[in-house]
Amino acid sequence: MIFTKMHGLGNDYVCINCFRERVEDPPGFARTLCDRHYGIGADGLILICPSKVSDFKMEIYNSDGSVAGMCGNGIRCLGKYVYDYGLTGKETLSIETKSGIRNMHLQIRDGKACGAMVDMGVPRLNAHSIPILSEKDLVINDPIEVQEKNYRMTGISMGNPHAVIFSEEINGIPLEETGRELEFHPRFPERANIEFCHVTARNRMEVRVWERGVGETLACGTGACAAVVASVLNDLTDEEVIVKLLGGELSVRWDRKVNHVFLEGPAVKVFDGVL
């Protein structure tokens, strides 16, 4: 079986072309391949599949084998793969995901895709649709407690659940413990991705991400989108923000006229391999 290792700002994936390969047990396969000691090592597994409703279908599995509804970095990697490996000559693509169809425009340099602008769709803010257990419809600056410490979170779904927490200091947060406790907090029926954010200007912020089913990652596309939506809802930033993550920067814009979030960032091939 041939695979390709790719990443978006260090958020890395093993990509399999399911037009020619067959994966019998995707969750187990993801756990095996993504192990950084006994496998290839990655944050997740991406299966590039045929689709009856769009150009391609993306199936994503986290490193623990759980299903990811959407991935902003992963979808850019998929776009680079299908263009660079000749599965399409189109620069504008529609991709079927578990969270719906997403459209993206590839950025081409020297005949290769180097990144993409992705329409990440409508941010879901209703507590039930995220889901977050709450007596209120919107979860904005809402208290939550873990390890006898109180935080304020804003809940958003970008095709997967996010809890965004703003803080003046994020580098000293023990994310290995705090992130895990928050991910499995009883208020999140489907668990949650956690973002700790420090706003440095109306158009810039720094973010650390704890990804559901993975742990702390160098970047998270849906997390960056959720962070910007949350910062706008809390009147901390404008609608267009540069998000600095551990692995680099993403550009995010929440166009409130159409209520869609747009994400722009790079996609990089690391290597090909054979299993």
Give each language-model segment a name.
Residues 155-158, 263:
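Active-site donor-nucleotide binding/catalytic segment of nucleotide-sugar enzymes
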Residues 1-112, 163-275:
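A glycine-rich beta-to-alpha transition motif near the start of alpha/beta enzyme domains, typified by
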Residues 115-123:
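Membrane helix-loop-helix hairpins that form the core translocation module of multi-pass transporters
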Residues 153, 161-164:
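Selected transmembrane alpha-helices and immediately adjacent juxtamembrane segments
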Residues 132-139, 179, 184-185:
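Short, conserved active-site entrance elements at the starts or edges of catalytic domains
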Residues 124-128:
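Short, charged/polar, Gly/Pro-enriched secondary-structure boundary elements
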Residues 1-22, 118, 135-156:
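N-terminal, positively charged, Ser/Thr/Ala/Gly-biased leader segments
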